[in-house]
Amino acid sequence: MSHLEQETEIFGLLGYEVYQDWDLLFDYEGGTLTLLDPTVTDACVASLTGGRPVTEVPIEMEGHIACVEACIGECMLRLGIDCGAGGDLLVGRLWESLRPTLTGRRETTLTGADAEARRVRSAKVKRLKIGDREFRRVPTVFNDMSHLNHSLKRGLDGLIGFPILSGQKTVLSYRSGRLIFLP
């Protein structure tokens, strides 16, 4: 993990088995992850939003991965949530079909959690929609995901991470099966 420790020493990673009984409140701007007792999640959201509307979408579990439906252009996608991902990832086969919805298409080098560098394609997705929340100019890498999809029943079209989760406070509720984007 030394390649992950460029500014902060990391002693380990938390996984689904650690926080599966909790709801997670991500506040990337504040640099906090709050574990919420699921019985207080709605009250916490109401307190944080002051009654302003939120975007709430259902999640479906695929093993240990929470998944949401998303839309890019006319293309409906099934995306896993990876709160540790520095960027978003879509399967390589979407590179050509999503061409009209992308800007800044190029090849780049990506270093994965295994510290191995790979040449990949990257671009910014002009508009990605989850529920009624629209995200613009989302930096995205296109690459093979067969190693992950091989172990999943339905498979994924990609993963969302920091670019989506960091734009606002976000709650991931495993117990109630929903992803909540706060205003």
Enumerate the language-model features and the residues they cover:
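Pepsin/retropepsin-fold aspartyl endopeptidases
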Residues: 1-183
